[in-house]
């Protein structure tokens, strides 16, 4: 019997089965058999019956192949797995057992919509009439009315999630910024993201030169002994041509951003960063009048991809990291020379496992980027890097930067910018709290990984940004969209 001890195990196992079958060339034959292999039955282990469990696996297989889980596909990277949804309560406010059925009936008096009725043992809220204003909860002297909402809806920073008539979550394509927080927060795993693992495997099997671009947020995510060299050795064993740190792209981005910031500052203009695709999506969808203020500098991922393709036009580039929005940058933004694919940690590990490759401890000897490029994975890292570059090049302007840490702070900063009330000159926006290290597909919680991450980065050499960039032909590719 398949034992699901966590939703993470289910996600990982589906990816592994798909990756293994893809390498073996048997996915067409195995596709319909994988659910039965994983869910043997006869007793269910995590849902009401084995048939629902198998359908959940079946829809996750479709996601693993880069398809929508159901028949309809709106093009969004983030998708609701309908067979796994609808088990959460929809009613936002509920009367709990704390209700004393008192004579005061303050809750009923506070409701302006007639949504609360007296009951035999406690008051009752009619969900059809309730407007979720919360006045009843505030009025109850016993705190007997609780605010209960779905984790997916709570986690969405742009109110892109609602429900259909059957209680299944619906993602509004026009509002969604692809941050992926809903997928991370759903305790039933009812929201997932499309993957490109079958595409990457097809290119590996075809003998193409596939390069991994590893996110700077990776250091610290897998323990103190797993270094960039560990990753480089592992992906090469799995068939990749080589691995390049995306932090190197951070150094490249820093140089270009510094030039943009200085020009804008001297012209009295405001700007926002462009390296976080979730933040960029937020601006374009919810503050479109500010879109022209987005830096034209490409992301570190794109910078490294362009560098690789300038050397080898036939190269295939694959970003690896904790970010869901990077998939959106690849699929939606269509930036020339950008990475061909983006994978999260579970997806690259599934590819490695299918090739019997594991991450192994290795000395921290491999380094492409400066320490400042490595800290691009943290909120505030872009600002620190740009200011360091200005210092190195003796361009010391009194530039003020708003470091917007997380979607809520991003919205606040953009609102001030929109109204002409932003006191700072620039906004560094990170849609995830903590920066990329807080991405929805992270392998470890920020607080647990922090010390390990800091120690790994401290062990790197202290090369300057300007010196590091001299190693590369920066004139062979453009740093702008």
Regions inferred by a protein language model and the residue ranges of each:
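Glycine-rich adenosyl-nucleotide cofactor-binding module
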Residues: 88-109, 138
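Iron-sulfur cluster-binding cysteine motifs and their immediate structural context
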Residues: 104-127, 131, 135-177, 181-197, ...
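Iron-sulfur-associated redox domains of electron-transfer enzymes in respiratory
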Residues: 1-60, 64-66, 193-481
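N-terminal [4Fe-4S]-dependent radical SAM core
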Residues: 70-96, 113-114
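Gly-rich Lys/Arg/Thr-decorated short loops/hinges at beta-loop-alpha junctions or inter-strand turns
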Residues: 88-94, 117-122, 163, 181, ...
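Residue-level recognition of alpha-helix initiation/capping sites
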Residues: 102, 131, 147, 177, ...
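Short strand-loop junctions, especially beta-strand C-caps/beta-turns
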Residues: 98, 128, 215-217
């Amino acid at each position: 019997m398949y034992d699901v001890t966590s939703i993470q195990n289910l996600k990982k196992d589906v990816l592994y089965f798909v990756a293994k079958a893809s390498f073996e060339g048997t996915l067409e034959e195995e596709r319909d058999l994988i659910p039965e292999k994983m869910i043997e039955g006869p007793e269910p282990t995590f849902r009401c019956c084995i048939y629902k469990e198998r359908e959940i696996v079946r829809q996750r297989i479709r996601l693993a192949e880069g398809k929508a889980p159901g028949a309809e596909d709106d093009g969004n990277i983030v998708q609701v797995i309908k067979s796994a949804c609808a088990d959460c309560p929809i009613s936002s406010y509920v009367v709990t057992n704390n209700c004393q059925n008192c004579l005061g009936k303050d809750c009923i008096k506070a409701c302006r919509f007639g949504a609360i009725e007296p009951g035999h043992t406690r008051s009752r809220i009619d969900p059809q009439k309730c407007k979720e204003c919360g006045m009843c909860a505030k009025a109850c002297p016993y705190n007997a009315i609780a605010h209960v909402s779905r984790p997916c809806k709570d986690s969405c920073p742009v109110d892109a999630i609602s429900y259909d008539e059957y209680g299944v979550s619906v993602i509004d394509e026009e509002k969604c910024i692809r941050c992926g927080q809903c997928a991370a927060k759903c305790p039933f795993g009812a929201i997932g993201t499309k993957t490109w693992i079958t595409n990457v495997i097809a290119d590996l099997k075809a003998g193409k030169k596939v390069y991994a671009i590893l996110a700077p947020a990776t250091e610290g995510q897998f323990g103190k002994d797993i270094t960039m060299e560990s990753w480089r050795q592992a992906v090469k064993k799995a068939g990749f041509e080589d691995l390049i740190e995306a932090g190197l792209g951070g150094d490249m981005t820093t140089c270009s951003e510094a030039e943009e910031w200085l020009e804008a500052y001297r012209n009295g203009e405001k700007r926002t960063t462009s390296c976080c695709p979730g933040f960029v999506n937020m601006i374009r969808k919810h503050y479109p009048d500010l879109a022209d203020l987005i830096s034209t500098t490409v992301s570190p991922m794109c910078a490294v991809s362009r560098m690789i393709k300038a050397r080898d036009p036939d190269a295939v580039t694959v970003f690896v990291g904790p970010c869901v929005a990077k998939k959106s940058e690849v699929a939606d933004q269509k930036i020339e020379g950008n990475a061909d694919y983006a994978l999260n940690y579970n997806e690259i590990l599934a590819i490695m496992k299918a090739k019997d490759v594991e991450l192994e401890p290795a000395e921290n000897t491999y380094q492409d980027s400066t320490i400042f490029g490595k800290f691009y994975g943290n909120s505030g890292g872009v600002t620190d890097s740009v200011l360091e570059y200005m210092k190195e090049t003796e361009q010391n302007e009194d530039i003020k930067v708003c470091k917007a840490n997380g979607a809520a702070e991003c919205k606040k900063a953009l609102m001030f910018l929109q109204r002409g009330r932003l006191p700072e000159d620039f906004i560094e926006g990170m849609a995830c709290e903590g920066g990329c290290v807080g991405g929805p597909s992270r392998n470890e919680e920020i607080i647990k990984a922090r010390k390990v991450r800091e120690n790994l980065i401290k062990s790197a050499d202290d090369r300057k940004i300007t010196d590091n960039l001299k190693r590369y032909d920066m004139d062979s590719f453009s740093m702008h969209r």
